[in-house]
Amino acid sequence: MSNIIDEIDKASMRDDIPEFRPGDSVKVHVKVVEGSRTRVQVFSGIVISRTGGGVQESFTVRKLSFGTGVERTFPLHSPIIDKIEVDRHGAVRRAKLYYLRGRRGKAAKIKERGSAR
């Protein structure tokens, strides 16, 4: 039974996802359905967490929109995600960056990770 579930999970996982971690700035291209039309909307921000594993994996992106913090959680292997672009890699020492919620301006900046990796 477990083998059947693993095969179904493997079949529904995407293989076009770039490597990114918490602290990275990403642009998530999301398919939005409005009536009969489908268009692509870009949500760009900083990845503050990745949770789960396999086909259930999801990630949360935070951005500031007109001074208000906006967070959106995306299932990683969802068909509504058109593509994910990594803008820059951030140097952080935490897996969950929830402390960014209480910071504004320069205090919310994340240093760029060098090419040593």
UniProtKB/Swiss-Prot annotation:
UniProt-listed GO biological process terms: translation
GO cellular component: cytosolic large ribosomal subunit
Keywords for the protein's UniProt record, in alphabetical order: Ribonucleoprotein, Ribosomal protein
InterPro entries associated with the record: Ribosomal_bL19, Ribosomal_bL19_CS, Ribosomal_bL19_sf, Translation_prot_SH3-like_sf
Domain of life: Bacteria
MF-aspect GO terms: structural constituent of ribosome
Pfam families: Ribosomal_L19 (PF01245)
Function: This protein is located at the 30S-50S ribosomal subunit interface and may play a role in the structure and function of the aminoacyl-tRNA binding site.
Family: Belongs to the bacterial ribosomal protein bL19 family.
Protein name from the UniProt record: Large ribosomal subunit protein bL19
Organism encoding this protein: Cutibacterium acnes (strain DSM 16379 / KPA171202) (Propionibacterium acnes)
Gene that this polypeptide is encoded by: rplS
